[in-house]
Amino acid sequence: GLTAIGEKAFSSNTLREVVLPESLTAIGSRAFASNQLTQVHFPKGLTIIEEGVFNRNRLENLQLPKNLTTIGDSAFSNNGLTHMEFPESLTAIGGSAFQGNLLTEVKLSENMTTIGSWVFANNRLTEVKLPERLTAIGDRAFANNQLTQIKLPRGLTDIGEEAFSNNQLARM
């Protein structure tokens, strides 16, 4: 069966739904960017979602594979996602990965140590529980949301520029 889809293989089309085969282990960057996808069905064995793969679509909800370890830069930016739950296997989310969605809620993996720059910027988040293992939050990671309070984990050593700018934070 199909094991890999190349870079930009199906970009700039009018695809609405994609069912990825169980044999698939690699999806090239921007493979499905700039379509009209509302649904994606992931294979269980997929561990990495590369840069920009689903950028500029119409995704509203996602069920990520349970073994996913990495989400690349801009992988799901500019969609219509309203909530996200991340598998415990996930340790890294690339810059701008979920920027420009409609997220009101995210459930982060407890194993996540780094949140990249702009990851959740320009959404509608009202609250977020940061994992205890988190050590770094990138520039503007949560900028332009609707957060009213945030509890910083003890192990956090680095908060980037404007990480929480343009929110409604009243408590920290």
Regions found by a protein language model. Name each.
Residues 1-4, 13-26, 36-48, 58-70, ...:
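Structural signature of tandem-repeat unit edges
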Residues 6-9, 28-31, 50-53, 72-75, ...:
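Consensus positions within tandem repeat domains that build extended binding/scaffold surfaces
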